[in-house]
């Protein structure tokens, strides 16, 4: 599993994942902006939605 905003999330059905795939398994509402921009981090490093995600990664997605 990976961790998303502190919650364990199991990714399944694919061999490899990118950050945007996480949204299929973690409920994060992108339809209503709650800040000026969306911050996405993988293991503390700023990332974009095409960044690869691996087992045991820590993902953070939040508005700033």
Please annotate each region the language model reported:
Residues 1-64:
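Ubiquitin-like/PB1-type beta-grasp interaction modules and other compact soluble beta-rich domains
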